[in-house]
């Protein structure tokens, strides 16, 4: 799923991504905390003007990003 300004989030896809994150994790609590922490960072980045204007809520964006990182680790720098 590509994240863009005018993107509509498919709720079924978002639910599947969230379930996949939880299912593949060894600790549900830590995964939930990761999602919340990432969402909080995105929210503050939005306030600081570091991110483009977006209609996607920070929690939705963090689930999508973490799911992409989990499914495609070769895209990460390092």
UniProtKB/Swiss-Prot annotation:
Pfam families: RNA_pol_Rpb6. It comes from the Bacteria. One of its GO terms (cellular component) is DNA-directed RNA polymerase complex. The keyword Transcription applies. It catalyses: RNA(n) + a ribonucleoside 5'-triphosphate = RNA(n+1) + diphosphate. GO terms for biological process: DNA-templated transcription. Keywords: DNA-directed RNA polymerase, Nucleotidyltransferase, Transcription, Transferase. One of its GO terms (molecular function) is DNA-directed RNA polymerase activity. InterPro entries: DNA-dir_RNA_pol_omega (IPR003716), Pol_omega/Rpo6/RPB6 (IPR006110). It is an enzyme of class 2 (transferase). Its EC number is 2.7.7.6. The keyword Transcription applies. NCBIfam families: PRK00392.2-5 (NF001574). Belongs to the RNA polymerase subunit omega family. Promotes RNA polymerase assembly. Latches the N- and C-terminal regions of the beta' subunit thereby facilitating its interaction with the beta and alpha subunits. In cyanobacteria the RNAP catalytic core is composed of 2 alpha, 1 beta, 1 beta', 1 gamma and 1 omega subunit. When a sigma factor is associated with the core the holoenzyme is formed, which can initiate transcription. This is DNA-directed RNA polymerase subunit omega. It comes from Prochlorococcus marinus (strain AS9601).
